[in-house]
């Protein structure tokens, strides 16, 4: 039987306030034991043991990245692979990609493309407003039916208060959040420390 031992690895789990250095033993792809000083002699008879010195390394539950941008030179699979290499087990894609995630068929396509893989789970935010302009509400009901877990204009704020009010009212009916980028474009770029009131 094969056992893998991660010696002296820092364990972090915010859900249980765990923050300690321990030895973690893996057997049959599951955690077999966690202890401060695991005695490997117990396993040495008739077992293959792979031991890794993990001093300075950290083990956590899977990390969820809630704001993923897919770059122009990347695609969904390459983004998932990069995420997996960095401990991300689930991710949410922002809508201002190419193509924009602004209609039900694109949301459905992304969800289907990411199913049945061993790569990180993919969720998507649908575009809150058409063309990220903040002027007209997108088809958030239909995008929700196709799997959008929330709605945002990504890295752009929704400036129009009436549009935002309509979005929040409709989103409440379909039990989906509206995520607002916290930036006032009319003020960004100004050196507010120079303005005296």
Regions found by a protein language model. Name each.
Residues 8, 23, 49, 54-55, ...:
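Generic alpha-helical hydrophobic packing signal
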Residues 38, 58, 129:
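Residue-level detector of flexible, active-site-proximal loop/helix-junction positions
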Residues 80-192:
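Divalent-metal coordination cores built from histidine and acidic residues
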Residues 195-197:
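Conserved small/polar residues in nucleotide/adenosyl-binding loops
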Residues 16, 68-70, 184:
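Short, glycine/acidic-enriched loop or turn micro-motifs at the edges of active sites
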Residues 15, 60, 72-74, 134, ...:
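Active-site-proximal flexible loops/turns
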Residues 1-44:
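N-terminal metal-binding scaffold of metallo-dependent hydrolase/deaminase domains
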């Amino acid at each position: 039987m094969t056992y893998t031992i991660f010696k002296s690895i820092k364990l972090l789990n915010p859900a249980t306030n765990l923050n300690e250095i321990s030895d973690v033993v893996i057997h049959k792809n599951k955690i077999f034991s966690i202890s401060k000083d695991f005695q490997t002699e117990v396993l040495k008879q008739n077992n293959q043991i792979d031991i890794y010195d993990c001093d300075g390394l950290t083990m956590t539950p899977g990390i969820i990245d809630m704001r993923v941008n897919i770059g122009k030179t990347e695609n969904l699979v390459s983004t998932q692979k990069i995420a997996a290499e960095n401990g991300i087990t689930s991710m949410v894609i922002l809508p201002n990609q190419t193509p924009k995630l602004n209609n039900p068929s694109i949301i459905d396509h992304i969800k289907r493309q990411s199913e049945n893989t061993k790569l990180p789970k993919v969720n998507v935010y649908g575009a809150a407003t058409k063309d990220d302009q903040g002027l007209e509400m997108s088809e958030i009901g239909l995008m929700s039916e196709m799997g959008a877990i929330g709605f945002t204009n990504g890295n752009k704020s929704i400036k129009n208060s009436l549009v935002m009010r309509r979005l929040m009212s409709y989103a409440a009916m379909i039990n989906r959040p509206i995520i607002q980028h916290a930036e006032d474009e009319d003020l960004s770029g100004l050196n507010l420390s120079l303005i005296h009131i």
